[in-house]
């Protein structure tokens, strides 16, 4: 018993603690009656972060993709939006004909944030997927742009006490 407490127990703690991600999709549920998708994102860190425009994509049985519209859990900020558009000039939201703004999801430290999406589709849903378009680029151009965006957003300190989370976030997909 003494060996277990001194060697194995600390080893198990190290292994289990190292597997936990900084920011992770904790849960995702589809309510076909309400036509809503609930996504829970957990911040396991001691820092307050924010994400830009997490996207829910829904695929129907006829292989039609539709995007969910975020209806709960987000804020908007004009100055932050203009900074994003100064870096990502080809972003659809940044084009003049669109009157939308990027969704900002605040992730307070050591918490779970609930985000709700609405969709309008009568077909049977096959797959629901959450993705993070401003996180975890793998090509060099994407990495440079992401670095520039983080630098501009964090130096502007638009959302007091929060910083932009730009690291990769593992996506989640549920199949019906």
Question: What positions do the PLM features span?
Answer:
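Asparagine-centered strand-capping/turn motif at beta-strand->loop junctions
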Residues: 39-48
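The feature marks short-to-medium sequence segments in extracytoplasmic or secretory-pathway proteins
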Residues: 48-107
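Structural beta-strand segments of beta-rich domains
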Residues: 35-37
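Short, surface-exposed ligand- or partner-binding patches at beta-edge/loop junctions that are enriched
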Residues: 120-148
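Short Pro-Gly-centered flexible turn/kink motifs
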Residues: 105-119
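Short beta-strand elements
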Residues: 142-176
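Short, solvent-exposed loop/linker segments at the N-terminal edge
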Residues: 29-33
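Bacterial Sec-dependent N-terminal signal peptides
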Residues: 1-26, 39
């Amino acid at each position: 018993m003494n060996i277990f407490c001194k060697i194995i127990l600390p080893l198990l703690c190290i292994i289990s603690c190292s597997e936990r991600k900084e920011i992770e999709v904790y849960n995702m549920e589809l309510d076909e009656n309400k036509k809503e998708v609930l996504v829970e994102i957990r911040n396991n860190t001691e820092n307050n972060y924010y994400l830009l425009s997490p996207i829910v994509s829904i695929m129907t049985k006829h292989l039609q993709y539709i995007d969910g519209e975020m209806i709960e859990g987000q804020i908007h900020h004009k100055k932050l939006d203009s900074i994003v558009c100064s870096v990502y000039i080809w972003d659809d939201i940044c084009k003049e004909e669109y009157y939308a703004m990027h969704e900002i999801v605040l992730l307070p430290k050591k918490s779970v944030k609930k985000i709700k999406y609405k969709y309008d589709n009568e077909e049977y849903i096959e797959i629901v997927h959450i993705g993070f378009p401003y996180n975890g680029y793998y090509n060099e151009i994407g990495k440079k742009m992401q670095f520039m965006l983080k630098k501009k957003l964090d130096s502007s300190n638009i959302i007091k006490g929060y910083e932009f989370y730009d690291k990769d976030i593992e996506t989640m997909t549920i199949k019906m």
